[in-house]
Amino acid sequence: MINLLKKFFIRLKIIFSSILEPYSNLYWSQEGEDILINRIFANKKNGFYVDVGAHHSSRFSNTYKLYKENYWNGVNIDPSLSSYVDLKKKRKRDININIGISDKSEILKFYSFNEGALNTFSLKKKNQLKLNYKLRKIEKIECKKLSQVLDGCLKKNTKIDLLTIDTEGHDLKVLKSNNWSKYLPDYIIVEISSTTLDKITKDSITKFLNKKHYRIYSKLHKSVIFKLIN
């Protein structure tokens, strides 16, 4: 009886897979960013990304689909030790770095919640999150500028196709820490909390990236994708 049930469920799985697979599209990101990015890059193979606030090898990842399906690789940066251990184990083609990113070299308080995707350096964000999530611990973390980290791990003239940043209220400081005369990603994904396109165009992140020759290309729920305009 048990064997018959096993065979039944196996056949059921095969049937549903054959029905759904031609019309389905797997994604790992929170808002479908990875599907959109894959469309933007037209299924480009062997691209290169930098993922700041990577969090996890696959869960909520903007880069795992590129890594898994299109053989991309890149740099994953996260201040959480548990995130780093997971990334190092499961993203072996990538460079995985356990450090915080800020607009200067400094030691910052890192607020860790029961939902690891919400961990943040931002005191303002921490105060908002603790109303609905449990603050597990506060620890002091070493931070460096993004330019310093990339200088230390990338070969000369490395082309960055995609920079994705998810640092829960700390994104602008990450952007300010880049060397824009040296590292110019084709596309950038950041979180902007403004809800309308009109407000997004007036946001401090948008104004900063506009000065670096980036323009809004697409918007999801919170994530905004910027494109480099040559």
Locate predicted features.
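Phosphate/nucleotide-binding beta-alpha loop and adjacent structural elements of enzyme active sites
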Residues: 1-230
